[in-house]
Amino acid sequence: MNSNYETAELEQLLSLNAPLENVEARWQRKARQNNSNTNNNNGNNGGDRFIPNKMNIDIGHFNLTKENSNPNPNAINNNSSTSTSTTATSSTTNNIESTLYKDTLANQLFESNSGDLESKILSFKSKAPVGNVSSSTNSLRVLYSQNQVGSTPTDQSLKKQFRQIPQQPERILDAPDIVDDYYLNLLDWSSQNVIAIPLGQTVYLWNATTSEIQRLFQVEQQDDYITSLQWTKDGNYLAVGTNSCTIQLWDVAHTKKVRELRGHAGRVGALAWNDYILSSGSSDTNIFNHDVRVQNHHVSTLSGHSQEVCGLKWSHDGGQLASGGNDNIINIWDINSENFETPAHTFEQHTAAVRALAWCPFQPNLLATGGGAADRTIRFWNTITGVCLNTVDTMSQVCSIQWSTTYRELVSSHGYSQNQLCVWKYPSMVKCAELTGHTSRALHTAISPDGETVVSASADETLRFWRVFEKENKLPTANRKSKEVSDGSMMRNINSLIR
């Protein structure tokens, strides 16, 4: 009895079983200690850089040395009456010198802040994102989800700049007996999705929708051959230039020659339509404008070249005609000027023949031109002011240029040594892709009506189809591969027909 009573009394005195009140948990004490240490270590200024304040040491050392070197030991006693005023004056002087020293040092370190000692060296503005993180969620997952590429409009625009361009052609067709001549224009793609190309003495039509092939006509004379061709805007008629100095107009739907235009004294190597006006460039150095509606079709002659005219292009609004020649000259003819038969501008910066001409579809009065093997440059011109806006050295002969109607880009075809197609981003002229495969120079290019595919015709006797400007949200990859397989079988049949 006594022992049990004594044990109960002892437990009551020690209160071993009673819970402790108003006692902080261990993690709370640790957090409070860390906060107190952090507050003690922080300076009053709260800046992110510490500069020691030692600028008064030299002044103090000077004063001590001056006092110790005083030859009169009684000077201190004699001047005891003025010690108070001397101390005040010295303190004021020290403060002024200290301020000047601070300002000088601050101006050297903080030039942009004009001596603001409270300014920070580094400024961190973009903070890590904060999400609703529960106890069971990894906190780093919030950072990963918030900082993925494409989460902001800027990232999305950067992502679009680096789109995928297929490096292999989508289709390859045989083009036997195509003429290997830099000064001719032998390929065009109509608005009805039909490609026209002369092989030998025969003009062939290939329907890109149905994959059907058609022989349009063959020249009659044995020594004659096709030198140029151009579709009308609606795709119903085809103009064909020949080595016999004539131009033939064909109704494709009825496979019928509508008329024949004469007048040139040399082969017709370049053609360009502007509504019912057909412009033709010849090796006789002249450009003829024909009104195909009337019997007397020849309406004007443009004489501005001294050698063969090998490039002709009307602007999209029909107001200007660009011509390039073997004399390395580009002429701009303004139809709205009082004297249309005199070039509004003449550009002589190219050092080789100029056949590659292309008007920009999204910026008026912007013309891209390409020079031959001795020049190798692409130049951009403002055809109103006559100023050369930019020049890019492509390191190879420029055969043709095509602008994209979907992107702010253009594609150029080249000769020796790579025989490649280059895709450029405008206006930076950064090379987006380089498409190789031709074993000889890619003389001609044309773009499809939907603006996605570029076809190239080469002296290696092949046609290659490149899906360069593919639009977004297209068919899945599996469907596209199955389509390519079916197209491949069609191509073999077409090649056998051509052969």
Swiss-Prot record:
Localization per record: Nucleus
Any Pfam family: WD40_CDC20-Fz
Top-level taxon: Eukaryota
Keywords: Cell cycle, Cell division, Mitosis, Nucleus, Repeat, Ubl conjugation pathway, WD repeat
GO biological process entries: anaphase-promoting complex-dependent catabolic process; cell division; positive regulation of anaphase-promoting complex-dependent catabolic process; protein ubiquitination
Pathway it works in: Protein modification; protein ubiquitination
Family recorded in the similarity comment: Belongs to the WD repeat CDC20/Fizzy family.
Subunit structure: The APC/C is composed of at least 13 subunits that stay tightly associated throughout the cell cycle: anapc1, anapc2, anapc3, anapc4, anapc5, anapc6, anapc7, anapc8, anapc10, anapc11, cdc20, cdc26 and cdh1.
Entry protein name: Anaphase-promoting complex subunit cdc20
Species in which this protein is naturally found: Dictyostelium discoideum
